[in-house]
Amino acid sequence: MQHKLIAFIGGGNMAQAIILGLLKQGYPAEQIIVNDPNEEKRAFFANLDVATSENNVGSAIKAEVVLLAVKPQMMAEVCSPLSAVDFSDKLLISIAAGISTERLNALIPSVKSIVRVMPNTPALVGEGMAGLFAPKNTSENYRTFAQDLLGAVGRTVWVNDETQMHAVTAASGSSPAYFFLMLEAMQKALIKMNIDEKTARELVQQSMLGAAKMVTENPQIALSTLRENVTSKGGTTAAALAVFDAQHFNQTIEQAMQACLSRSQEMETLF
């Protein structure tokens, strides 16, 4: 991975995950600047020998890569002073949901290379899944850099059509919460079956981890086949799946993901 000076605007959880991933891979701490108004967050990064600042504009001027890690509703306010900076030879990366590259270009008119990223929280444990999009005028060099950057905390996929980022949000950006909800429901059900809370959690989390590993280690096997392999006719698994089917499980999942996609589309019009 090339070493470029990166200015992180915002030092929240996702920025922390990316920076820790970079440092773990040997990226030089002196090639990172973190800008955040929160003193505790700056102290956290200072303990990692990473430079910190409250001067977004000054850091953006110095850096070749500027990564916007702020909430969507803060984007316009954060970008307003940055619009005075010449971004023509810089890479702008945004990990904010619902902010299009067109909107970023309007906020910072001089920018020529933009990569929009939809990461997810498993990046905090190095198992993230990030969707990336870049307009055609973003250089191949900067595309590769952005991919390597997010690759420090998980896997990446590119989409060719920016509208697909809404589906990426539904598929990976928000989906950790779907899985947590499933685990939570299973744990609660086990507690009602007189299993203690700790044991219930261990049972469900290891089962999900094992199932996920079976999926990732057997990409040639269809998901439906993996499910069928666990399901004996007239058996216990079949009884459980029959209830899911009766409760329209697949349709509920699809409707939930569609609601997520629709909200992502709506957010593009708000910020």
Curated annotation (Swiss-Prot):
Which pathway does this polypeptide act in? Amino-acid biosynthesis; L-proline biosynthesis; L-proline from L-glutamate 5-semialdehyde: step 1/1
Catalyzed chemical reaction(s):
L-proline + NADP(+) = (S)-1-pyrroline-5-carboxylate + NADPH + 2 H(+); L-proline + NAD(+) = (S)-1-pyrroline-5-carboxylate + NADH + 2 H(+)
Keyword terms of this UniProt record: Amino-acid biosynthesis, Cytoplasm, NADP, Oxidoreductase, Proline biosynthesis
Cytoplasm is among the record's keywords: yes
Q: Which residues form a coiled coil?
A: none
Record's subcellular location: Cytoplasm
Give one GO term, molecular function aspect: pyrroline-5-carboxylate reductase activity
State its role.
Answer: Catalyzes the reduction of 1-pyrroline-5-carboxylate (PCA) to L-proline.
Q: Which family does it belong to?
A: Belongs to the pyrroline-5-carboxylate reductase family.
What's this protein's name?
Answer: Pyrroline-5-carboxylate reductase
